[in-house]
Amino acid sequence: MDQEQILEKVLEVVRADTHGAASLTLFALMKTMSTDNGQYLFLLNKLRDISPDMRELAYGLMELMAQGRNQAESWNRTLADIESAIRNG
């Protein structure tokens, strides 16, 4: 999947179940990786709580961060949409 597909799929997962384990885990991972000067502290054992398909999305998000794409406008826009969905969900 490319960047847009990964971000769109994550947003789709969150909108489908705003307070589900996968939604909140993916949101926490994205939020953690959004601070460029942060240390990206995330409890990887949380990945055990989600399905293999959702872990694939998490790995995709990690790859985007490794490529420096976690500072892109599309990342920030998706994160804002996710925050809004969770807040209003």
Please annotate each region the language model reported.
Residues M1-L29:
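Short terminal alpha-helical segments
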Residues M1-I6, T32-D36, D53-M54:
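Helix-boundary capping/turn motifs
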Residues T25-D36, G60:
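Short, hydrophobic/amphipathic alpha-helical patches that form generic packing surfaces
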Residues Y40-Q67, E73-R77:
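Short, charged early-sequence alpha-helical segments and their helix-coil boundaries
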